[in-house]
Amino acid sequence: MEFEVKKTFGKARLGVMKLHHGAVETPVFMPVGTNANVKLLTPRDLEEAGAEIILSNTFHLMLKPGVEIIKLHRGLHNFMGWKRPILTDSGGFQVFSLPKIRIDDEGVVFRSPIDGSKVFLNPEISMEVQIALGSDICMVFDHCPVPDADYEEVKEATERTYRWALRSKKAFKTENQALFGIVQGGIYPDLRRESALQLTSIGFDGYAIGGLSIGEERSLTLEMTEVTVEFLPEDKPRYFMGGGSPELILELVDRGVDMFDSVFPTRIARHGTALTWNGKLNLKASYNKRSLEPVDERCGCYTCKNFTRSYIHHLFDRGEVLGQILLTIHNINFMISLMKEVRRSIESGTFKELKSKVVEVYSSGGVNV
């Protein structure tokens, strides 16, 4: 892959990644399609929203449908009908989020969330699966510590992440895919620095900031991001794993981060909350019952062009899945539009003004929450 920083505004960067399935402008938000689909959306919905790259999950696809089924389709792109770039997570986040039977230097034995059977995953298996999936960007297999881990536990996870990164790179034998390293270190600046230096000494196509936005205070999220970015190379993309709220993304862009993913926009849509340029909007609330306004007057998505707040409120009131679909369409369109505005503002030198507005309306809870 190739990455070029075209312009900067402070630490905020306007760039472009050239990947096997196309170019991706940064800063970029990646909708999450864990099981080879973004919940409730078709690939055409994503294309119409302007999504340039999506994320899928190695661990879950390894379980169902299984690598052999995806190989029958000659890769994940054909399997899910998506022609643009894909990033696959390595399964490392599941070290933190799923029940584990055993974790040591060799790898992790999980309890399958599907049938309770034992599943073994290590750097070599993760690389083998991601190569078979054919994703444009693959992630090293890492050890993401739990939020309440003490210093020694985080240190052990950080050292293991380094050893697993070495093994991941050694096992990554492919030409058309990129491999990103993942920096760990929890909320400890010295471990963040150590991890960043270790990963950059190996050399990867890009670097992710992992193990944050998992329950720690926002101030710590931002502080640890600053510490990490300081030791990452200028000529490689930087990816904050799991950051998806508008105000957090703007804060992170201001600190030099280029890539983001989260289930946040789609998850809150399924629960009746829309993201707008004035903050969050609760479509379940009774004050929308008679509203003839669109979800967001500034939005040109299918939902906002064709339906009123009143209608979407009615759909949620009656438990109709169409309400969830329409808000998911809108929220993904909003996030893609937000990132376009971020890129324009870096280009035009107005990023600070955009950031101030977005942080203000979302940090205050927005309107009609």
Curated annotation (Swiss-Prot):
Which segments carry the region annotation RNA binding? 242-248, 266-270
> Which GO terms of type biological process are on file?
queuosine biosynthetic process; tRNA wobble guanine modification; tRNA-guanine transglycosylation
Q: What is its EC number?
A: 2.4.2.29
**Pfam families in the cross-refs:** TGT (PF01702)
Q: Which pathway does the database say it acts in?
A: tRNA modification; tRNA-queuosine biosynthesis
GO: which molecular function terms? metal ion binding; tRNA-guanosine(34) queuine transglycosylase activity
Q: What is this protein called?
A: Queuine tRNA-ribosyltransferase
Q: Please name the taxonomic classification of the source.
A: Bacteria, Thermotogati, Thermotogota, Thermotogae, Thermotogales
